[in-house]
């Protein structure tokens, strides 16, 4: 499960290997927007007091094309969901056992 502010790495596409943080999760479409990744040019018409022109925006990526990066071992991982001692559900790195926030 991906959450906002998770540190992720891109697994496929033109930005393969780049790292960034999740800015937004679009759960209904299984997509995420990652900061600084998948930049596309968008043509906007002027409307009201807003200028028109070509602007750069971050486009959504499918969740299958990103993986969470463990801060301790610095590798892409799929987290394991476990219950902590205090009863809270936590995500844990399968490789090193570090808790992912």
Swiss-Prot record:
One of its GO terms (molecular function) is structural constituent of ribosome. Pfam families: KOW, ribosomal_L24. GO terms for cellular component: ribonucleoprotein complex; ribosome. GO terms for biological process: translation. Keywords: Ribonucleoprotein, Ribosomal protein, RNA-binding, rRNA-binding. SMART domains: KOW. Transmembrane segments: none annotated. NCBIfam families: rplX_bact. Belongs to the universal ribosomal protein uL24 family. One of two assembly initiator proteins, it binds directly to the 5'-end of the 23S rRNA, where it nucleates assembly of the 50S subunit. Part of the 50S ribosomal subunit. This is Large ribosomal subunit protein uL24. It comes from Elusimicrobium minutum (strain Pei191). The lineage of its organism: Bacteria, Pseudomonadati, Elusimicrobiota, Elusimicrobia, Elusimicrobiales.
């Amino acid at each position: 499960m991906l959450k906002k502010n998770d540190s992720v790495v891109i697994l496929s596409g033109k930005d393969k290997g780049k790292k960034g943080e999740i800015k937004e999760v679009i759960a209904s479409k299984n997509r995420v927007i990652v900061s600084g990744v998948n930049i596309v040019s968008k043509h906007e018409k002027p409307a009201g007091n807003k200028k028109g022109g070509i602007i750069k925006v971050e486009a959504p990526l499918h969740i299958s094309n990103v993986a969470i990066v463990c801060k301790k071992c610095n590798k892409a991982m799929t987290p394991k969901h476990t219950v902590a001692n205090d009863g809270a559900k936590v995500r844990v790195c399968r490789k090193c056992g570090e808790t992912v926030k």
